[in-house]
Amino acid sequence: MKKNIFIALLFIGGLTACSDNNEGSDIPDNPGYPVTHFSKIELKEVKEEPGAPAVTVTQTYDYSAGRLINFTSTQSFVAGGELFKIENATNVVYGDHQAVVTDEINNISTYTLDDNGYAISCVRQEMDGKIRSYTFDYLINTEGKYFLKNITETLDGNKSYSSINIDYSSYRTLRITQQVDKSEQTYIASTSTGNEIANTSEIPYLFLTDLYPLSFHSVAIYGKFLGDAYNTLITDLRPEDNSGSNETTTYTYRFDKKDVDISCSELTKSYGTDLSLIHISEPT
């Protein structure tokens, strides 16, 4: 959950699906791995704070043959009338039952994939020599979709340090429990009762990549080798124990004529104060 106060704009753009007649589509028949039907997903966040220049953070996910191949994160700001940009690139290389993610500073995450292209484990080798190991577990529905149910992180080969468990017992209300070292926090993510919104664009939940240890795996989440996006869109998120703060986050969505999710507004309130206001919309 975001604790700092800021106002941001977040854009999802480049959601270019295959043409209706599939002409020119590079997605093979029966690909044997989870497919994303967009050539690019772009998220743009503009952070504004008093006394500091606005910083634009752009995250771009590029796909080929329905698979994520590149991720680029760019920070840009204007100071003294000059535009500054800081860019970090991450690439994904696929092998036999394997996806290798290498970032700008040579942190290497090697995912072992099952026969359907979903990760069952990962070893992350960081530039300072630290090794993080992960295991993943899924709920598989009747349509054969994989929904991430558990991630467990082990440090230096033997110390279980963190985990996230997602309880799908109620499809309208997900219970997400995050454990880091000896602390634990549970979040309740829900959709409107009797008015579920179908996630036709199959965009991952934005808040998942903010939760440690999933924060190390945003590329895998957007690459779908950590499972498929859930069938419905979340409209409310809150800590299970929010009796003191009454903290809640609400999401509203806007769609194009093909029911592709092109706009979302996120509003977090705590102790009666707006903590963040985020709008997601298509670039103009």
Give a label for each model feature:
Residues I5-G13:
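Sec-dependent N-terminal signal peptides
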Residues N21-S281:
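Buried hydrophobic residues that stabilize the cores of well-folded domains
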